[in-house]
Amino acid sequence: MTLSPLEKTGILIEALPYIRQFYGKTVVIKYGGHAMVNCELKKAVMQDAVLMHLVGMRPVIVHGGGPEITSMLGRLGKQSQFIQGQRVTDAETMEIVEMVLVGKINKEIVANIHRYGGKAIGLCGKDGHLIEARKQVAHIQKDGEEMDLDLGYVGQVERVNPGIIETVIAEGYIPVVAPIGVGPEGESYNINADLVAGELAVALQADKLVLLTDVEGILADRDDPASLISSLEVGRVPELIQQGVIAGGMIPKVNCCIRALEGGVKKTHIIDGRIPHSILLEVFTDTGVGTMVVPG
C-alpha cells in the first residue's frame, strides 16, 4: 500500500502528542517470538527502537531466544526437555544457552540497531550484577502427591540493580539485555525473558512495558480475531482465566503485566509482534494495537 503525502502528514500529526507525552520516558520492550525470526519484522523492531530513541524516549530491549537455543542444542546433539514450559538446564546446556543469548543473539540485535541509525550496548544480568537470581524449582503433582523437580540452572529474579542500565541510557545508548541472571556464587541462570522484562520495568519505574507475542493480544473468543480485548482491567483476570479466555502461555504474560503494574509501571501492553512496526502503532497512534492491561 502506497500512502499519499497527505496521508503521511496525517500520521505524523497523530504521532505528535504522543512524542511530546513520552519524551524522556522509559519503555521496556520484551522482544521475542516470530519478530525474532522473520527478517522484515526484525528490521521493523530495530527501526521502531531507533525512532523512539531519536525522538527522546528511553527504549530498553529485553530479548528471548528459545528457538535458536533449541536449534543449537540439536546441532550439538543435546535434546531439549521442558517441564511446565521451562527448559531443563544442566551445566552444559547453561553454557550453550549463555553462548547463544549473550554471544550471538544479543550482539546481532546491537549490530542491527547500529545498522539502522541507532546506538546500542549489549548486556546480560551478570554485567554490574544487573540481575541477581536464585534457583527456580518446578512444583508438580504426581500420583496425587506434590513434588519438587530440580530444573538445573533455571532461575528467578531475586533483585534488579538498574544502575548500569541508567548509565548506558545517560550515555545515549539503547540497552539490549539478555535474560541471564547471576547467582550468589557467580553462577549463571537462565531466566524467562518476560519475567526479566517485567522486573526490569519495575526497577526502572518505566512508563510502559510492551510484550511482543505471536497473537493479536487477548481474545474473548480465540477463534475470532475481531474479539480482541483492547483494554483489560486486572480485576477481570481471574474470571477470564477460569473461563479459559486467558490460557496457556498467555497466563504468565498477563501475570507479568500485573506484577509490573503493582510495582509502579504505569501501563503494560501485550501486542502482536507479527505486525510490522507494532511497537510504533502502540505508542504513537490513537487506537494502539493489542491488549493494554491496566489497574482496576
From Swiss-Prot:
Q: What is this protein called?
A: Acetylglutamate kinase
Q: Name one GO molecular function term.
A: acetylglutamate kinase activity
Q: Which organism is it from?
A: Moorella thermoacetica (strain ATCC 39073 / JCM 9320)
The entry's function note states: Catalyzes the ATP-dependent phosphorylation of N-acetyl-L-glutamate.
Q: Where is this site: Transition state stabilizer?
A: K30, K253
Keyword list (alphabetical) reads: Amino-acid biosynthesis, Arginine biosynthesis, ATP-binding, Cytoplasm, Kinase, Nucleotide-binding, Transferase
Coarsely, its chief localization is: cytoplasm
- What's the short name of a Pfam family annotated to this entry? AA_kinase
Family membership: Belongs to the acetylglutamate kinase family. ArgB subfamily.
